[in-house]
Amino acid sequence: MTGLIDLFKEALVYPTKDYKALLIFGVIFLVANLSSVFTAWEIELNGGILALLALVSLILYFVTEGYILSVVKESIDFNDEIPALDIVANFVDGLKLLVVQIVYYIIPTIIVLLVGWLSGTYSAIMDIVEYMGQDVANTTVNATTMVNSVPQEYWAALFTGLLITCIVAIILYIIFGLLLEIAMCRLAKYDEIGEALNFKEVIGDIQEIGVGRYICWYILLLVISIVLGVILGFITAIPYIGILIAFLVGAPFIALFGSRALGTLYSDAE
């Protein structure tokens, strides 16, 4: 079993093993974000060009997601080489990953919406809107007065409901986010959406990795990604060329690093 420190050291070096592959991936990243580049350069585009760029960005989004999945697969298979870009195959894999992501996030979303209803959040909002609506006809009443006129118990009910809903939402999205990472590994390994949606096997894989080890890995990944993101932010601040470097090298580097770290971690469950 690879130590977490060694795992992340190797993952940080991984993107530099093939600069050509990194730059090719970077070009895809750059083209997918051309609208952001033009915005940063304060270049105004007409609606037709913006629509075309949006379509290209959407297509390349799935390509990049699928490519990241291929990096995870190669890492699970203990392959140290950065995989070649296959636009069609990567696009299809990106669509598969989207299906998995929707399933894993729609479950906590439904639960959170249900909790919002049970906690009285929606009814509190309706009570406040209805109460404030009574003063709408009075044009002499300003917004501040309308808000202050609402009984405190209405605001208390809203605050309590929102607090409960937010706490449940944070917990659920963290849990399902952790499950999704392993589901992504199963999709990469078996190339079947059904395997990624097999919650029993996903939980079993996490147990094989070790719950504590997995949580520590996730925290370290977040910390390192934040540090890299801050560095990337400083680079982006460089006029004109900064944003090119960010999309051509920085963002692809972080993506390859994260996917390599994930695939290597999952290989411990093999």
Tell where the protein language model's regions lie, with residue ranges.
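Juxtamembrane/interface motifs at transmembrane-helix termini
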Residues: I43-L45, L113-L114, Y122, I224-S225, ...
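Alpha-helical polar/charged "hotspots" used for coordination or helix-helix interfaces
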Residues: E74-F78, I203-G204
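Functionally constrained cores in energy, signaling, and assembly domains
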Residues: N33-S35, T39-N46, A84, N90-D93, ...
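Short, small/hydrophobic-residue-rich motifs at membrane-helix boundaries and re-entrant hairpins
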Residues: K20-W41, I49-I76, K96-I174
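Selective recognition of hydrophobic, aromatic-rich stretches within alpha-helical transmembrane segments
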Residues: L45-I76, W155-A196, L232-E270
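A cross-kingdom feature marking solvent-exposed beta-strand/loop segments within repeated
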Residues: D77-L85
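Interfacial aromatic "cap" segments that immediately flank transmembrane helices
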Residues: T2-A32, L85-I110, F159, L178-V230, ...
